[in-house]
Design a protein with these regions (language model features):
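Glycine- and acidic/polar-rich repeat regions and solenoidal domains
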Residues: 1-199
Length: 200
């Protein structure tokens, strides 16, 4: 059990971090499973993954003002987690940076966050990025996830004058999105030509 953690107001207040920016391409092989994170709201990254080949599964994040952030590193897996926001401000889901991840069978309900706090945020990248910055989202598979009454699913998150590389070779398939209050199922901040949308 992890909780409660009030808003800290700056970086360095993750509830859990695996690795550092300098270890991004080292395999940690850490498994985070069967935990309850309740109102863990220290900063935007509740669980911050900064290494490769980790698994985050079967956890519940309850009213956490932040996300599971695949911040640095490749080939991480996020599956069978439950995110419940109950409409609480800045409650989020999963933020995606880097390559080779699999994100599947997660259930996300009532998440009110936007942009970096989105229920799903797939980020734009910095061209020729150092491992410690924002590397391109490539070869990422997102499938069989269920989103219910979430404020924001966003592709191209963080696009600005520096982050200009859209995701490539990404698939978003067999997902369920239910939200009667939205006119569109997701927001595309940048070009989504590199993302395959199928059977959603």
């Amino acid at each position: 059990y992890f909780g409660e953690r009030p808003v800290y107001g700056s970086n360095g207040a993750e509830t859990m971090r695996v690795g550092t920016s300098q270890q991004a391409y080292s395999s940690s092989n850490t498994v985070i499973e069967n935990n309850l994170f309740e109102r863990c709201s220290g900063e935007v990254e509740v669980i911050s993954i900064k290494s490769s080949d980790n698994i985050i599964r079967n956890n519940t994040l309850l009213e956490c003002e932040g996300v599971v952030a695949l911040r640095h590193g490749d080939r991480n897996t996020v599956n069978d987690n439950l995110f419940i926001g109950n409409g609480r401000r800045n409650t989020g889901g999963i933020r995606v940076v880097n390559a080779g991840h699999q994100i599947y069978d997660n259930t996300l309900v009532g998440l009110a966050g936007t942009r970096f706090f989105s229920a799903l945020g797939v980020m734009d990248a910095v061209p020729n990025s150092l491992p410690t910055r924002y590397c391109q989202v490539v070869d990422v598979k997102m499938y069989r996830n269920t989103f219910v009454d979430c404020t924001n699913i966003e592709f191209g998150t963080g696009k600005d004058m520096e982050r200009t590389l859209a995701p490539e070779k990404v698939s978003f398939t067999d997902n369920i999105i239910i939200n009667k209050g939205l006119d569109q199922p997701y927001i595309a901040v940048d070009d989504v030509a590199g993302i395959q949308f199928k059977d959603n």
